[in-house]
Amino acid sequence: MSFKDLRSFIDHLETNGELKRISHPVDPHLEMTEIADRVLRAKGPALLFENPVGNDMPVLANLFGTPKRVAMALGKEDPLALRDVGELLAFLKEPEPPRGFKDAISKIPMFKQALNMPPKTVRNPPCQQVVKTGDEVDLTKLPIQHCWPGDVAPLVTWGLTITKGPRQKRQNLGIYRQQLLGRDKLIMRWLDHRGGALDFKDFKEKHPGERYPVVVALGADPVTILGAVTPVPDAMSEYAFAGLLRGERTEVCKALSCDLEVPATSEIILEGYIDPDEMAEEGPYGDHTGYYNETDSFPVFTVTHITHRKDAIYHSTYTGRPPDEPAMLGVALNEVFVPILRKQYPEIIDFYLPPEGCSYRMAVISIRKQYPGHAKRVMMGAWSFLRQFMYTKFIVVVDEDVNCRDWNDVIWAITTRMDPKRDTVMIENTPIDYLDFASPVAGLGSKMGMDATNKWEGETDREWGTPIVMDEAVKQKVDAIWDDLGIDDAPTL
């Protein structure tokens, strides 16, 4: 099942008990965050605040607050089904020619999906039903959340920032938070390695001193939103990838002020430009780490046009100590990464990014070990293969008999199969998340790899322990007589 716009997804969630309408007045200043946070931690529904204090525009929150709703947005019921998305991405990153007629037939579904890649341009799009320019442009009239007490100002959080570099054929979609600075001003907080910042850098080099056109879409259809947070190949537009996932071409329209294309069914569109000479101090803001981040200088986005649907809905979120909505997205997208990594490293059994580790700062990988030093090879590969893992500080590698998603198993492996000196890899002066204040230098720090696998000859001279495992026949016999023993609540093994 695919959703043409955000509203059809909202209706689907409500029909299935996954969305709650809140008619009681709720203030976007702090109150929405507290309510959304409590509901998310209780694994509750998406929330539609119909009566935000000081505004008549409804606010949608917690849309992707559970992995199940992320899967539902892609027309699936089980987050594990998102591995199909990973299989598609693995194919797109490194397509292989068919090995014969039968293999060619098996690849037909993927080639058929590829036909849905080019976006479809439409006229009279819903996102331009209402047009505001000049003095009508007033960002303060949007119900922008002020998430935490220490935040310096309200913050646009779920905007899809649309850019295009002079050397690129495709447009880039990225999600960068934007601090409200004034009636027509936002601070565009994109880090140097992100697609929007790279496009802007290329533009400045080719067109020094000129204004850079930028568009921000709020409330796009759910597949396009998720396409913007998925590791799409660099040469592919997120619009094209969204078309693949949806099974239908992404509908776009031309922005009114520039040649950029925007999702046609979006709720709200902000059009404008960045002057390369206009910068502003951004922050502090509460972030997904659970701390307020440092302030820094970023470009100012000047909004010249606001267009929106009639009766528009404002899509918002908050970030804080996990679990938060980005952490839940991370849990779901974890399943996307597994097939991509397996294509490069078939020995990988499973891969886990614990949400409490800020969804990317720690990874646990289980492998089918085949030779001495194998765990270290996998560590190095994981750090370097995907850009998403360049900021992962800790990697633990375990054997296939260890459930890498069960901390009881992982801690057991670390404490029984590791020597701290022999089995720890330390690498200094590597890229680190800018928000990681624990690193000695902003953006530069160390990484630790832990080999918690059984050691082979060449890795140890000692006789290695054999795990204790009960005889399977005995277990089956005890299963058969358990009800006769009078012991309640048999543990699940």
From Swiss-Prot:
Q: What does the Swiss-Prot or TrEMBL cofactor note state? A: Binds 1 prenylated FMN per subunit.
- Write out the annotated subcellular location: Cell membrane
Its UniProt pathway annotation is:
Cofactor biosynthesis; ubiquinone biosynthesis
According to its UniProt record, the EC number is 4.1.1.98
Positions binding prenylated FMN in this chain are I175, Y176, R177, R189, W190, L191, R194, G195
Q: Which GO terms describe its biological process?
A: ubiquinone biosynthetic process
Binding of Mn(2+) occurs at N172, E238
Pfam families in UniProt: UbiD, UbiD_C, UbiD_N
Catalyzes what? a 4-hydroxy-3-(all-trans-polyprenyl)benzoate + H(+) = a 2-(all-trans-polyprenyl)phenol + CO2
Q: Which cofactor does it need?
A: prenylated FMN; Mn(2+)
Annotated GO molecular function terms are:
3-octaprenyl-4-hydroxybenzoate carboxy-lyase activity; metal ion binding
* Active-site residues, record numbering mapped to chain: D287
Per UniProt, which keywords does this protein have?
Answer: Cell membrane, Decarboxylase, Flavoprotein, FMN, Lyase, Manganese, Membrane, Metal-binding, Ubiquinone biosynthesis
What is this enzyme's class at the first EC digit? lyase
Taken from the UniProt entry, a GO cellular component term is: cytosol
Q: What is its main location?
A: membrane
Q: How does it sit in the membrane?
A: Peripheral membrane protein
Say which family it is in: Belongs to the UbiD family.
Assembly notes: Homohexamer.
Record HAMAP family:
UbiD
NCBIfam families cross-referenced by the UniProt entry: PRK10922.1, UbiD family decarboxylase
What the protein does comes down to: Catalyzes the decarboxylation of 3-octaprenyl-4-hydroxy benzoate to 2-octaprenylphenol, an intermediate step in ubiquinone biosynthesis.
- UniProt name for this protein: 3-octaprenyl-4-hydroxybenzoate carboxy-lyase
Q: Which species expresses this protein natively? A: Shewanella pealeana (strain ATCC 700345 / ANG-SQ1)
